[in-house]
């Protein structure tokens, strides 16, 4: 689920491969995996399962039957994995490394077989990985649109535009802040783009030591940990579409204060966002930050500062993997007690299942029937 360190960085090759496979299965979602291979999938239950893993506020049916949708998603997922493996092999990367990197990149899990992550490899492997991290930060429904030649839907995607603007904007600010540290413009563009996409996709590979970046850069990257990539991607975080709806909802609240008699509707991709969806997004945001605060308090009992505790909570909830040590931005958990580790593990599951499907298990109403 999350790229974390501190439980031992040296494993046998079998363990490394198994870890990458679990990354890969979890990337698209265990529920979608089961739905894809289930012999029978009822429409009501299958739609709930698909929304649990691809819950974006505007989650739409790719094709009429949910089981067919899940199979289509996995066909795209598998194809992207195979293509990346082939490209890495063509670049001279060993087969074992290519397979593990590809499984962890397409799933945005971020596990690597080398302790210093992608910094162990050359620019070619990093650039290939950058491309696939970017693709897997996008909604898989866009890939379906490409296959169906529905390019108008892609052009109308406000979330895709926001994703491009955020990535390029943060990369530009990072480049300005660290311009004097790089030997060339090309080197600076490469590392800043790689780090921005790595964080917003919640993959969390590194192409350069994390301590290289300034506190200002890490402040921006922490915000990206929270927002995450597009809805319907394999990444974690709140998702950009939710953030966009939250911003529009806040603006509407201000507008209603100024002009209370006016009708203010929230639009996304040219469509009106239903009030139930807006309410669900607002509830998700409240639940997310309540979990961050609760985790930070628990970790403070373990001796961590509130800042480090909140960073660890955000990292776990967003399935990123950076966080506990604010000086090195690595997530070392070996020094934490069992309660703190359990809370972080719960946060990882909570974030991976988009909070509410996990909380449903603990709701009294669930067990009354």
Positions of predicted regions on the chain:
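Membrane-proximal intracellular helices of multi-pass ion channels
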Residues: 2-369
């Amino acid at each position: 689920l999350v790229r974390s360190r501190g439980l031992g960085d040296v494993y046998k090759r079998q363990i490394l491969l198994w870890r990458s496979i679990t990354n890969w299965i979890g990337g698209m979602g265990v529920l979608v995996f089961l739905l894809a291979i289930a012999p029978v999938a009822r429409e009501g239950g299958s739609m709930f399962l698909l929304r649990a893993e691809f819950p974006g506020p505007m989650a739409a049916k790719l094709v009429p039957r949910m089981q067919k949708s899940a199979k289509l998603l996995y066909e795209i997922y598998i194809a992207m994995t195979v293509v990346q493996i082939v490209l890495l092999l063509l670049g001279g990367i060993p087969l074992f490394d290519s397979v593990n990197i590809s499984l962890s990149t397409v799933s945005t899990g971020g596990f690597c077989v080398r302790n210093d992550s992608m910094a162990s490899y050359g620019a070619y492997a990093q650039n290939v990985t950058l491309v696939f991290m970017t693709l897997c930060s996008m909604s898989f429904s866009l890939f379906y649109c490409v296959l169906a030649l529905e390019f108008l839907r892609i052009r109308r995607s406000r979330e895709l535009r926001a994703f491009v603007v955020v990535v390029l904007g943060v990369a530009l600010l990072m480049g300005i802040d660290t311009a004097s540290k790089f030997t060339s413009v090309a080197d600076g563009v490469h590392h800043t783009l790689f780090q921005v996409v790595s964080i917003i996709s919640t993959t969390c590979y590194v192409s350069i030591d994390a301590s290289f970046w300034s506190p200002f850069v890490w402040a921006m990257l922490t915000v990206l940990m929270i927002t995450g990539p597009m809805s319907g991607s394999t990444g974690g975080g709140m998702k950009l579409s939710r953030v966009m709806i939250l911003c529009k909802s806040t603006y509407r609240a201000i507008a209603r204060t100024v002009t209370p008699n006016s009708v203010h509707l929230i639009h996304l991709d040219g469509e009106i966002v239903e009030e139930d969806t807006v309410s669900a997004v607002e509830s998700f945001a409240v639940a997310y930050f309540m979990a961050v605060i609760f985790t930070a308090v628990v970790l403070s009992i373990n001796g961590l500062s509130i800042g480090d505790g909140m960073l660890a909570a955000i990292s776990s909830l967003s399935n990123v993997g950076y966080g506990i040590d604010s000086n090195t931005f690595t997530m070392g958990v070996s020094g934490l007690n069992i309660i703190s580790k359990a809370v972080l593990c719960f946060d990882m599951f909570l974030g991976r299942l988009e909070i509410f499907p996990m909380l449903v298990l603990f709701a009294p109403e669930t067990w009354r029937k």
